[in-house]
Regions:
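Flexible, D/E/H-enriched segments
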Residues: 1-22, 33-171
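Short beta-strand segments
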Residues: 25-28
Length: 171
């Protein structure tokens, strides 16, 4: 999804997002880790990231199991998406940078970018929001290359604006 296309979709959807009678639900899994997903990135603290294989499995640190590395990768993306007042533009930029850096296999990467772009447009129209994550889980705690896991996270976006949203203020 190009930046221009994303902004065009965001402009179309922003007025619906501004309507308090509308509920948006953005649903996505987070990291899909394991050989079957073709994603085996591992990074212990202070180490360079590696793609794990039979030849590189010696990089797994006993004090930092694979499932903690997955949580750290997801945590970087969640931290990028989370923001307070007037932060959607920065969140979008940081999220895209995090995806580029980690190659995280988030299925809904583009719906998340679209949501952040909608919020950015609304912030440009003087509205304020926050986005916070409330829960995180993994389908299994990976310990070896034979394991696989899918991560799940829950977040919310809420308006911090004192007045209701007015779609006519959008440009």
């Amino acid at each position: 999804l190009s930046t221009d296309a994303c902004r065009a979709y965001a402009l179309c959807l922003a007025e619906y997002f501004a309507d308090p009678r509308t509920l948006f639900v953005i649903s996505t899994d987070f990291c899909h880790w394991g050989d079957r997903f073709r994603y085996t990135r591992y990074q212990a603290p202070e180490d360079e990231p590696v793609v794990l294989s039979c030849d590189t499995k010696h990089h797994i640190r006993e004090y930092f199991p694979i499932h903690q590395s997955i949580a750290a990768i997801d945590g970087e993306c969640m931290a990028a998406i989370s923001f307070g007042r007037q932060g959607a533009a920065l969140a979008r930029t940081q999220y895209l940078e995090s995806l580029q850096r980690t190659h995280n296999t988030i299925c809904g990467r583009y719906p998340i970018v679209l949501l952040l772009t909608i919020l950015e447009l609304l912030e440009e129209a003087e509205y304020a929001f926050e986005c916070r994550f409330t829960h995180y889980e993994q389908s299994s705690a990976c310990e070896s290359l034979d394991d696989s896991s899918v991560s799940y996270a829950s977040a919310y976006v809420r308006s911090l604006s004192q007045s209701g949203l007015d779609a006519s203020r959008l440009t």
